[in-house]
Regions:
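C-terminal beta-strand-rich structural cap/linker in extracellular carbohydrate-active enzymes
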Residues: 515-532
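Noncatalytic carbohydrate-binding groove/subsite architecture in carbohydrate-active enzymes
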Residues: 301-406, 412
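Aromatic/acidic polysaccharide-binding cleft in carbohydrate-active enzymes
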Residues: 395-452, 466-469
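Substrate-binding cleft and catalytic face of glycoside hydrolase catalytic domains
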Residues: 186-349
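Beta-strand-rich binding/interaction modules
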Residues: 79-90, 123-125, 493-513
Length: 532
């Protein structure tokens, strides 16, 4: 049966090649050689016959840059077999194809292309037995690092790549190489904050009042800071039964042991040693626990408030310039969170906290309502700062949603936004995989481009104000290099408005220039208007 399928596929390929000759502009030309420089591996066949990728260190390229695709024949069993190679991009309206015959003596089949259009470019490989492979390449300008006016963050799980083994590393790369490539990719986007959650207290201290091992955290802090980014440290999670408060020892369940409130004396010893070790590190954001109003903390609100105040006091006493904020609250708009916001307001007024954390993961159908409900609570609590949205993505992480959520988070006065999450891992059951905008090989999807576009236009811009804050029409105004930038988007239905007056250039959510007519449709796909 397989031979029959292959026979018919060869015929189909031959027919397609004939018609392709009539339209040479849509064809791909290949070079086959026995020698190739090392290339970034974007995948390989399960049977080890093929490897494929791009020449370079990451999967992101500048507009107009020549990109070389490499397809390597790794086994003589492919000798003489034919394959169809396709290159497609929705943003660039490209659909090209070509054909190769595998040659064991010249195992590297390569082609090059370039494009001035930002977007995702997908290379597909189809064999005569109908087996298919594909990978994505992103084209977008390399961004300047976002400045400190707003934190554009990611949660890339570099700790897992460094410590948890092959299932969490990039395929074909060791732990250190994986960390470097992850951060190089983040650096290309211009993000200025990395949030990590996988180095808990128990990984650093093995016994009460014992020595603290900073090896992994030193690596993380140094690597992130070397890339010009701040490090969001989630300071929390107890270290095992020996570290929990006495009242919880009889009911201690090891499967959720890290969620119990700690013995405060033992905990504060750990915090003190940590604060002393990083006393000169002002590029760390200290987030005290994660979702203390949810399953990550088994204690009462009052137990968290005590932990929060005492921990913040230790940190601020060590260095008053430390940036400290309360743990991001799950389901941030719930009225039951009011006491948490009130405690944050109290500690901000005491100069023990700089801000409060919250998590709004919702999709665009609820984002506007839930954000404004949360802001009503924070206003009622007396908070004078806008918070840090230190996790956002689970309820919606497609290209338009990530862009709109980042935009609206800043529009409502926050100081930071962390897109959750950054990358998939090889381990399929990993809970981050459904929300990532890079896959396990760091191949980007559309959301990577749109998030980078937010940073491209606004990462070094000053927020001037919100012109319209209606669900179906949000207009934000920024200023960058003396130029006004207005961003139009909707968190609800489409709205048609008159096109802006004046001389300007408009861009779509991928950063590609677009023409405007007398009216524009404002949707959940942001439009950036840059005045000349």
């Amino acid at each position: 049966m397989t031979q029959l399928i292959s026979f018919f596929m060869v015929i189909i390929f031959a027919i397609e090649m004939f018609f392709m000759g009539l339209f040479p502009s849509d064809s791909i030309s290949f070079t086959q050689t026995d020698n190739s420089d090392s290339f970034y591996v974007n995948g390989e066949s399960e049977n080890g016959l093929l490897r494929y990728g791009v020449a370079g260190d990451i999967n992101l390229f500048e507009p107009g840059e020549e990109i070389t695709v490499v397809i390597e024949c790794c086994d003589n069993n492919l000798e003489g077999e034919q394959a169809k190679i396709s290159l497609k991009s929705e943003q660039a309206d490209i659909n090209k194809r070509g054909y190769i015959v595998f040659d064991a003596d010249n195992p590297y089949s390569m082609f090059s292309f370039s494009s001035d259009i930002n977007g995702i470019y997908t290379v597909s490989i189809e064999l005569t037995d109908r087996t298919k492979y594909s990978f994505n390449i992103g084209i977008l300008p390399r961004n300047e690092k976002a400045d400190d006016d707003f934190l554009y963050g990611i949660q890339p799980y570099i700790t897992r790549a460094y410590c948890w083994g092959e299932g969490f590393q990039l395929p074909n790369y060791n732990a250190e190489e994986s960390v470097n490539r992850i951060l190089d990719t983040a650096d290309y986007l211009g993000v200025n904050l990395v949030r990590e959650d996988s180095v808990g207290w128990g990984a650093m201290q093995r016994e009460a009042f014992g020595a603290v091992d900073f090896t992994v955290q030193d690596m993380l802090v140094n690597k992130v800071n070397e890339h010009g980014m701040k490090y969001n440290w989630i300071l929390g999670f107890n270290a095992g039964e020996w570290s929990v408060a006495d009242k919880y020892k009889d009911s201690y369940d090891e499967s959720t042991g890290w969620t119990y409130p700690p013995n405060e004396e033992i905990w504060l010893d750990f915090v003190t040693k940590t604060a002393e070790h990083y006393s000169d590190s002002t590029d760390i954001l200290w987030e005290i626990w994660n979702e203390p109003n949810w399953d990550f903390f088994k204690g009462s609100p009052e137990e968290y408030f005590s932990l929060l105040e005492k921990t913040a006091t230790v940190l601020k006493n060590q260095n008053h310039e430390f940036y400290v904020f309360s743990g991001g609250l799950a389901v941030a708009q719930k009225e039951s969170n009011l006491p948490f916001y009130q405690k944050s307001a109290e500690l901000i007024n005491k100069n023990l906290l700089n801000n409060f954390g919250y998590h709004n993961h919702d999709g665009l159908d609820n984002y506007y309502d839930y954000m404004n409900a949360m802001l009503g609570l924070t206003d009622n609590a007396g908070l004078s700062v806008g918070g840090i949205n230190s996790e956002s993505g689970v309820g919606g992480s497609d290209a338009a949603t990530i862009a709109c959520k980042a935009l609206y988070t800043r529009s409502t006065g926050a100081e930071g936004f962390v897109s959750f999450s950054f990358r998939k891992t090889v381990t399929p059951e990993n809970d981050v995989n459904n929300f990532a905008f890079f896959n396990e090989y760091l191949q980007p999807d559309d959301a990577a481009i749109t998030y980078a576009t937010v940073i491209r236009f606004l990462g070094n811009a000053e927020f001037k104000g919100n012109i319209s804050n209606e669900r179906n029409l949000i207009i934000d105004e920024y200023e960058k290099d003396g130029k006004t930038i207005k961003v139009y988007y909707s968190l609800g239905d489409t709205t048609k408005i008159s096109a802006p007056d004046g001389s300007y250039t408009a861009y779509d959510m991928y950063g590609n220039e677009i023409k405007t007519e007398k009216t524009i449709k404002v949707t959940n796909e942001p439009i950036y208007v840059v005045y000349n």
